[in-house]
Amino acid sequence: MTIKITRRTFKLGSIAAAALALTVGAGAAQAAPERIGLDYAYYNPVSLLLKDKGWVEEEFKKDGIDVRWVLSLGSNKALEFLNGGSIQFGSTAGGAALVGKANGNPIKAIYIYSRPEWTALVTGKDSGIKSVADLKGKRVAVTRGTDPHLFLLQALNQAGLTEKDIKPVLLQHPDGGRALVSGQVDAWAGLDPHMAKHELQEGARLFHRDPALNTYGVLNVREDFATENPEIVERLLAVYERARKYSLENPDELRGYLVKAAKVEDEIAKKQLGERTDLANPVIGEEHRKALTAAGTVLREIGVLKADTDVPALVADLIDDQYIQRVNRQQAAQR
């Protein structure tokens, strides 16, 4: 049997095939992911409450989306998980996210989970170290790629020193604190709640503080995930907002989650949350662009970012406020 294909038949068939391809493609783009991965971290207290409450699972259960929680011990680990795709949402410091973005990490900063003073330079109670200048030739515990690391580099720069003038000892944050109090290092670029713990329990001294050098706590999302699933991103941020507002209304309960998760005493959690954590403004925007541009300019000057880095363009590429802005508009319309 011979099948005759006319030009008209061919055209109609091509149109039908194209329409089918568009339909299949659209369906694939709209299909919900099977799983969402996000982190929790002791430096992001709201994430601890959110994980324990089960509100993310509650939000996505009706879609059949599984939720996987991963512990980030520092911004470096969160960025590693984001880059590898094991999580889609990760908590970092703003400065760490900026450096990660410059190094090719495919992320967008979409939300402010806190405005902290979570890092300082710390030494032992009986140490002779009084200023940053005294760190020359000393062993300093630090976690590379985190806000404490960037804080240390900027503090050294202000004192006319570089990282080459000290002896960095590379440890994760909890191990750095333990190394300090055991005398294995002379100083530590600290991070709460570990910093507050050693300050209260062993008399560790915060010998150099500068709140302006602490960059904001930002929630990041993988770019590809956000592009494919903007509604999921907005729903996740809406749940984060529920947890943030609940935390502000129930500070004692939030403190309890930090005590439980980080296994610290109540007085330690009280110092971190009561004195050094601000949850008031979750909307990432111009304030944060200015702060990260200033920090990025310094990081470029001291060699953390490449000399030819266009810092304003890098910051603009990192920060994406469209999701939280839409969430705010939706919530305002519901009031």
Predicted regions and their residues:
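Twin-arginine (Tat) signal peptide motif
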Residues: I3-A17
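C-terminal segment of classical bacterial N-terminal signal peptides
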Residues: L20-A29
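Short, glycine-/small- and polar/acidic-enriched structural segments
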Residues: A32-T162, K167-Q172, D186-A189, L206, ...
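Extracytoplasmic/secreted envelope proteins and their assembly/folding machinery
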Residues: K53, L79, N83, G94-A97, ...
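Short, surface-exposed acidic
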Residues: G64-R68, E163-I166, A262-L273, K306-A313
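Pocket-lining segment of extracytoplasmic ligand-binding domains
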Residues: G95, P168-V169, P174-A262
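Secondary-structure end/capping motifs
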Residues: T227-K306
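Conserved C-terminal helix/tail region of periplasmic/extracytoplasmic solute-binding proteins
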Residues: R300-R335
